[in-house]
């Protein structure tokens, strides 16, 4: 398969043709990768079972891993869900369009192929101009996981998508204006107590300011038990892992620095390629290996924006081991621990 790569130019006539071409591909059951404000998504018509099956095949993704349906207007909630609680509307009013995915009870039009056979559906309204225009132009709801080979770090640039999926999908829309760089937060509203199923840009505290008590599913850190179908992407299967062995080190700052330096020196002496993820304030503590700053210590958004691009770069550099300081904010720590890390080490 020859994959079309089309770059958004901000010329209205040229871009209109790109959206029309991509929309036609989606309506005919094809696959289109496109940018969102979080990461690049791999889209298909959500109500076309054969099209969604192509997503699983292209990514090498387990078919019991649910897909997120992307919509362009609030009315779609009532078509895709048979029960829209008040809390869902409050969250939509606060965070949509944006990096929020809500799990709701599904309506009869939603095929089991995108829900893992469950009675719930994951729904998101993206804010990125390309994603929003593609949904409107295509006239379909778009099921879209991240546009990467399953298990690889999520793509924040078109080049990442091309590397993973060129020749496997019909089209890639290029527009490298991904603002956030990490996945949407997924919250389950199908049960009595709202529950975060996947950490992301929106934090537990941000939710609780709008709808009250929210819990975090223990499966985020403990994993989903064998034989259980996950309610959301990322719960059962390890997502976004670099090829390198990634270790998060937390504890007293001096002990963390000592532990990382000792292990970096030891591994380099054994011939391994090693990297360190730190902060602007902590860079001076390390002088061996590939040293990468994730931003300032108190800026979780900077760390989040850099995360997947940095992991991709480590893959390109054939890094064997990565040591990361544990960031102060619970949200980013949770992202690292649940998505990418092989070990969380306390010192």
Positions of PLM-derived features:
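Active-site-adjacent structural elements in enzyme catalytic cores
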Residues: 1-338
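Single conserved hydrophobic/aromatic residue that forms the stacking wall/gate
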Residues: 336-347
């Amino acid at each position: 398969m020859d994959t079309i790569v089309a770059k958004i130019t901000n010329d209205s006539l040229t871009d209109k043709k790109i959206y029309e071409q991509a929309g036609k591909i989606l309506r005919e059951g094809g696959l289109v990768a496109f940018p969102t404000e979080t990461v690049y998504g791999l889209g298909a018509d959500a109500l076309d079972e054969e099209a969604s099956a192509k997503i699983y095949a292209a990514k090498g993704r387990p078919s019991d891993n649910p897909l997120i349906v992307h919509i362009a207007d609030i009315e779609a909630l009532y078509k895709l869900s048979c029960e829209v609680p008040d809390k869902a509307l409050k969250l939509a009013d606060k965070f949509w369009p944006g990096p929020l995915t809500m799990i709701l009870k599904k309506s009869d039009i939603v095929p089991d192929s995108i829900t893992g056979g469950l009675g719930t559906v994951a729904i998101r309204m993206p804010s990125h101009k390309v994603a929003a225009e593609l949904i409107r132009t295509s006239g379909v709801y778009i099921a879209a996981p991240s546009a990467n080979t399953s298990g690889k770090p999520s793509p924040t640039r078109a080049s990442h998508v091309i590397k993973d999926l060129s020749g496997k999908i019909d089209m890639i829309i290029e527009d490298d204006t991904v603002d956030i760089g990490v996945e949407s937060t997924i919250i389950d509203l199908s049960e009595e107590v709202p529950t975060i199923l996947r950490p992301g840009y929106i934090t537990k505290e941000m939710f609780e300011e709008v709808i009250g008590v929210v819990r975090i599913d223990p499966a985020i850190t403990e994993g989903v038990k064998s034989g259980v179908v996950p309610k959301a992407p990322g719960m059962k299967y390890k997502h976004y892992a670099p090829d390198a062995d990634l270790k998060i080190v937390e504890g007293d700052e001096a002990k963390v620095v000592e532990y990382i330096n000792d292990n970096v020196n030891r591994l380099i002496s054994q011939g391994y390629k090693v990297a360190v993820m730190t902060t602007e304030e902590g860079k001076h503590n390390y002088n061996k290996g590939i040293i990468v700053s994730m931003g300032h210590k108190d800026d979780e958004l900077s760390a989040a924006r850099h995360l997947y691009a940095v992991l991709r770069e480590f893959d390109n550099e054939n890094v064997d081991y990565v040591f990361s300081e544990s960031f102060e904010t619970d949200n980013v720590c949770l992202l690292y621990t649940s998505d990418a890390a092989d070990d969380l080490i306390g010192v």
